[in-house]
Regions:
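Residue-level detector of beta-strand face positions
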Residues: 5-7, 41, 56-58, 105-107
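Terminal connector regions
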Residues: 5, 94-131
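Short, solvent-exposed loop/turn segments enriched in Ser/Thr/Gly
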Residues: 32-39, 101-103
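Asparagine-centered strand-capping/turn motif at beta-strand->loop junctions
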Residues: 42-46
Length: 131
C-alpha cells in the first residue's frame, strides 16, 4: 500500500455491538450448526460524512482456528452516514464449535476520498448451557 492509500482511523467514527443472540432453531448446514445473530450500530460522531465500502471479520473458534471474511459493503448496502447519524443492522455468524470470538473493521471513504477505518469491538459467541 502506498502512502497515498493510507487508511486513517477517523476520530468519532465508532462501532457498538448492541446484542448477540444464539439462534438454536435456525436452519444451518451440518458442518456449522451454531447460528449467532449480532446487532451492530456504526455511529458517526465525526465532522465528516462517511460511506462504508467494505468489512473484514476475523472469527476465532475455541480450537484456535481462524476464519477471515472480507466483503463489499454491509448487508448488501454501502451506507452513507452523515455526521451525528448512525447505521444499525443485524447479520449472523455460523460456527462449527460451541464458542468463538469475532472482531474486525469497516472500511469507508470520506467526501475527500480519504480511506477511513473503524474497528468492530471483539465479542464472544457461546452456546448457552453446554460443556
Amino acid at each position: 500500500m502506498s502512502a497515498a492509500e493510507k487508511i486513517l482511523e477517523l476520530p468519532g467514527l465508532r462501532v457498538t455491538v448492541d446484542r448477540v443472540v444464539y439462534q438454536p432453531d435456525a436452519q444451518t448446514p451440518p458442518d456449522r450448526p451454531h447460528c449467532f445473530v449480532y446487532y451492530i450500530t456504526i455511529h458517526n460522531d465525526s465532522e465528516a460524512t462517511v460511506t462504508i465500502k467494505g468489512r473484514k471479520w476475523v472469527v476465532t473458534n475455541e480450537g484456535g482456528d481462524v476464519t477471515v471474511v472480507e466483503g463489499e459493503g454491509v448487508v448488501g448496502k454501502l451506507p452513507r452516514i452523515d455526521p451525528g447519524e448512525k447505521f444499525s443492522y443485524n447479520s449472523f455468524h455460523l460456527l462449527d464449535t460451541r464458542c468463538a470470538v469475532a472482531e474486525g473493521s469497516y472500511l469507508g471513504v470520506d467526501p475527500n476520498g480519504r480511506k477511513v477505518l473503524t474497528r468492530i469491538p471483539r465479542f464472544e459467541m457461546v452456546v448457552p448451557g453446554g460443556n
